């Protein structure tokens, strides 16, 4: 699943949709596409018209399908407001009605995976600073979506931000935010969180779902960046570790010479890889 921003701004590089779709098709892997803000036609009068080029190359901007016991839904939450490059995170009434009808066919308790571009929640909301939410970085009418997903074991796959993040906005919901393969707009091999360019891998067994992060230039077993004592001048006496795609449910324990030394203390800071660019 490509969670949007398939290319750079379409108005500046209009030929790219076709070669990108051809290259992905040549891989022999089935790809499903989500519309992102960089995939919109600009300068048009409505959000519907902003998705014309996307639809010509990839089909509808919202749709659903089943694979095994899992129901997948792709939504379009990039709402173009008809001026310049401006857009907001929003699901219109037509799309919400369609989603109601689609979910009416899905038994309660089933695993549902929702793919969209703009994340449903924000760091500002999670810290209680609602007034700091930016309308183009969050799904503004997320509560409507959350209510529809209440009967299910739901996972939301989103993108838009240039970092990886995991959180549970509601007890029945788990959202996975994915950084782009372009990381910092191709200017560095790391995203804003100091994690190497890569992608999320999701494995299903019946209704069950597990996941891990796969850095493009590293084996699956590589899941963190570690800095020894003295490398981080802000914490000169500490071993510092950036755990890739960290999950709030995890406890990180450090070992020395094969012996456990106890849980590590979590803090918010800067990865040394980015500081030294």
Listing of model-derived features with the role each one plays in the protein:
Residues 1-9, 36, 111:
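Active-site beta-strand/loop signature of hydrolases that rely on acidic residues for catalysis
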Residues 3, 106-125:
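Short acidic, glycine-rich surface-loop motifs adjacent to enzyme active sites
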Residues 4-5, 36-37, 117, 159-160:
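Active-site glycine-centered loops adjacent to acidic/histidine catalytic or metal-binding residues
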Residues 11-108, 127-155, 163-205, 209-212, ...:
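Extended active-site neighborhood of metal-dependent phosphoesterases/phosphodiesterases
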Residues 205-237:
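Short, compositionally biased P/S/T/A/G/V-rich stretches that sit at domain boundaries
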Residues 238-244:
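Short edge beta-strand/loop segments characteristic of extracellular beta-sandwich folds
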Residues 245-249:
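Short proline/glycine-enriched turn/loop motifs at strand-loop junctions of beta-rich domains
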Residues 275-277:
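Conserved small/polar residues in nucleotide/adenosyl-binding loops
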């Amino acid at each position: 699943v490509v969670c949007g921003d398939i290319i750079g701004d379409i108005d500046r590089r209009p030929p790219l949709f076709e070669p990108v779709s051809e290259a992905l098709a040549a891989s022999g892997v089935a790809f499903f596409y989500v519309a992102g803000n960089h995939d919109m036609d600009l300068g048009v009068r409505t959000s519907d018209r902003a998705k014309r080029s996307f639809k010509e190359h990839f089909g509808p901007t919202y749709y659903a399908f089943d694979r095994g016991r899992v129901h997948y839904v792709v939504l379009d939450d990039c709402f173009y407001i008809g001026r310049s490059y401006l857009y907001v995170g929003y699901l219109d009434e037509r799309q919400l009605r369609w989603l109601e009808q689609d979910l009416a066919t899905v038994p309660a308790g089933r695993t549902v995976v929702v793919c969209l571009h703009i994340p449903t929640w924000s760091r500002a909301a999670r810290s209680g600073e609602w007034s700091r939410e930016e309308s183009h970085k969050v799904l503004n009418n997320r509560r409507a979506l959350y209510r529809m997903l209440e009967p299910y074991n739901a996972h939301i796959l989103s993108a838009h931000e240039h970092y990886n993040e995991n959180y549970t906005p509601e007890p029945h919901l788990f959202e996975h935010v994915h950084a782009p393969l372009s990381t910092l707009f191709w200017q560095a091999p790391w995203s804003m969180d100091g994690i190497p360019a890569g992608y999320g891998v999701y494995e299903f067994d019946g209704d069950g779902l597990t996941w891990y992060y796969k850095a493009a230039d590293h084996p699956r077993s590589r899941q963190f960046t570690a800095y020894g004592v003295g490398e981080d001048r802000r914490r000169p006496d500490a071993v510092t570790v950036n755990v890739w795609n960290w999950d709030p449910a995890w406890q990180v324990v450090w070992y020395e010479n094969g012996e456990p030394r106890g849980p590590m203390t979590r803090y918010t800071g800067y990865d040394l890889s980015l500081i030294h660019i």
